[in-house]
Every structure is written in C-alpha cells, then in structure tokens.
Amino acid sequence: MKTPGFDTYDPWSGEQRPLYLAPMAGVSDLPYRLLAKECGADITITEFTNSTALSREATASWRKMESDPREQPFIPQIFGGEMEDMVTAATMLEESADVIDLNFGCPAPKVTNICAGAALMGEPQRLVTMVENIVDAVNVPVTAKTVSYTHLTLPTKA
C-alpha cells in the first residue's frame, strides 16, 4: 500500500491535530487548496467530483483533480451511485492520490437523485459493497465522508 506521507491511524490530540480544509463544491480548486496550505492547512481535499464523469475522462471533471507537489498529501474526493464508475475513477486516481475520499454525505438533490452521496446511507449493504470493491481495487488508503440522515427524505435505487 502506498504511504500517504502522514500516519492515517495515529491518534491526534490537542495541538497535534491536523488542520483540514474541508472540500467545498465550486470552491476547492487547486489555487484555493494551495493558498490554504500556505495559510497553515495540513490537509486539503478536492471538491467532490462525479465518478462517472471521471471514468468517461470528462476534461472539466479532471480539471478538478489537478494537484501540485506542494499539496501533500493529495486527497481527491469522488461521489457516484454506480459501483463500476466509482471503482474505475478510484483506480484512475490511484497513481496520483495519497488517499481517496468517498463522498456519502452530500444531501443535494442533484446528487441524491442519482442515488449517490447521502442517498447511499439509506442502502447500507450497497454502500458497504461499494467501499469494499474500491478498497480491494486500490493500493492507497480510502476514507469516507458520511452524514447522519435520519431527518432527510432520500430516494433509493429501484
């Protein structure tokens, strides 16, 4: 397994906890992430990007995945509702990524309507199978953003 450049399992406490820049759609482009690094962020994450678009090599989506050696560790975040596209996108990112982050937390209708993001929280076995397939396919650590969705009404895949 590729070493991410920091100990992903070391318990952090007090002053030793890393400062994260949370991924923000339409905001977390490369210049913004580099600025955050210069201002003290230890870890930055790309904005979430559709795995189907990445697997089809859509230029605009790959632009969101631009990285720079100053941005270490490099952590791209992907989302999607199609298992094959999620696995394909993760394997395509594996060489450049130090960690791959999966978004299972976005409640936006444009995401949940394709049974992605928070919608997958309503299908735990499907979510677990997706994560297992991605973890088995790549040699970098995989993390996930989730949400407690008890008050959300989400669509499920038929």
Residue spans for each PLM region:
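Single conserved hydrophobic/aromatic residue that forms the stacking wall/gate
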Residues: 151-158
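Non-cysteine beta-strand/loop elements that form the S-adenosyl-L-methionine
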Residues: 46, 99-107
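Alpha-helix-loop-beta-strand connector modules within alpha/beta enzyme cores
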Residues: 66-73, 121-142
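Glycine-rich, positively charged N-terminal anion/phosphate-binding segment
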Residues: 2-9, 13, 24-96
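Conserved non-cysteine loop/helix-boundary elements of the Radical SAM core domain that shape
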Residues: 51, 114-125, 129, 152
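Short beta-strand/loop segments at the ligand-binding rim of alpha/beta enzyme cores
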Residues: 16-19, 73-75, 138-147
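Active-site-proximal loop/turn and secondary-structure-junction residues that shape catalytic pockets
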Residues: 50, 80, 106-108, 148
